[in-house]
Every structure is written in structure tokens, then in C-alpha cells.
């Protein structure tokens, strides 16, 4: 009996620090891009890639850059964990499970908006029938962005595309506390 109690106590000691570490890794963000109550952090990945912009004519006939799609690799430390791409934006795990933007993203300016793309809260849904690690993801936050803004100079020709390098940290959330 005492041996079982010791095993349970040891398990609790080992679990509580892990739970508090997961909780402490949830970032502080502007309230408008906070994840709704009742959701928990599942994954955190660093993204490295480009934001692809395309030259289009605006309503006044001038050329502007418009975001076409992201193209990035997701990393868990040094391990490639997936990809972020397409329009509407999609995130695909190494196991083939995939989520896609399912509603309007909510945006908040990055701390240095002149250099860095905004922070986002994106509702997502499963995009495939593949059961995998993204199967239960319902929100993704894009935070800690660096770079990625459209070029400062106006485009010269309709249809021109350019990739603007960026980095970000993506936080994946599922239902449950």
C-alpha cells in the first residue's frame, strides 16, 4: 500500500510542474486576440518562411500589393513539424492532419507594425478526414512576428509576386481546459 502511495505521489510531483509549464507558455496578448475561455494550448511552433504578395490594381487604378498566401515551415525546436501555406491559410502536420481558416481572423498590431506583420487569432477547422494531431485544433494564434510586411515600394506590373521573409510563433488550441 505504501509503495502504491509513493508511486502516486511521485507521479503527481512530476505532473504538476509539467502542467504549470504548459500553462506558463500561454502568451500574454491583447484581449481582442485572446483565445476564448474553455480552450487549452496544444502545440507551439516557430514558423520560418515568406508572406507572398501579388501586385493588383486597386479601385483607383493604382497598383498595390495584396497578400496572396503564406508559405512557411513549422518547427518544434530543430524538428520540422509541419507547413503553413495556401489561401485560405492552412496548417498541415507531419502526420497529414490539416486545419484551414474557418472564419474571420482577428488582428492586433505587432509591437513594431512598421516592420512586422500583425498578430492574429484565427478560427480553424479540420480540412481533411485524416485523424491526427491537428484533429482537435480550433484556434491558432500568430504571435511574436518578425518581418513579413508588403514591400514599401509600389509594384510596377500587375501580377508581379514577391516573397517577404518572416518569422512567427504559432500557438494551436483545442477545446477543453
Locations of the language-model features?
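Primary mode marks residue(s) on the alpha4-beta5-alpha5 output face of response regulator receiver
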Residues: 23-52, 59-177
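Bacterial N-terminal signal peptides
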Residues: 8-17
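Sec/Tat signal peptide C-region and signal peptidase I cleavage site
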Residues: 18-22
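Bacterial N-terminal signal peptides that target proteins for export
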Residues: 1-8
Amino acid at each position: 500500500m505504501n509503495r502504491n502511495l509513493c508511486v502516486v505521489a511521485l507521479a503527481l510531483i512530476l505532473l504538476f510542474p509539467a502542467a504549470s509549464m504548459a500553462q506558463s507558455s500561454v502568451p500574454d496578448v491583447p484581449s481582442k486576440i485572446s483565445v476564448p475561455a474553455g480552450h487549452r494550448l496544444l502545440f507551439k511552433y516557430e514558423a520560418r518562411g515568406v508572406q507572398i504578395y501579388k501586385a493588383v490594381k486597386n479601385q483607383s487604378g493604382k497598383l498595390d500589393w495584396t497578400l496572396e498566401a503564406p508559405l512557411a515551415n513549422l518547427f518544434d525546436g530543430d524538428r520540422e513539424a509541419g507547413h503553413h501555406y495556401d489561401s485560405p491559410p492552412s496548417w498541415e502536420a507531419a502526420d497529414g492532419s490539416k486545419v484551414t481558416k474557418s472564419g474571420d481572423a482577428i488582428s492586433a498590431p505587432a509591437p513594431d507594425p512598421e516592420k512586422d506583420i500583425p498578430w492574429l487569432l484565427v478560427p480553424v477547422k479540420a480540412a481533411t478526414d485524416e485523424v491526427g494531431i491537428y484533429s482537435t485544433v480550433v484556434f491558432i494564434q500568430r504571435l511574436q512576428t518578425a518581418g513579413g510586411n508588403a514591400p514599401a515600394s509600389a509594384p510596377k506590373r500587375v501580377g508581379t509576386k514577391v516573397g517577404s521573409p518572416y518569422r512567427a510563433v504559432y500557438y494551436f488550441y483545442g477545446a477543453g481546459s
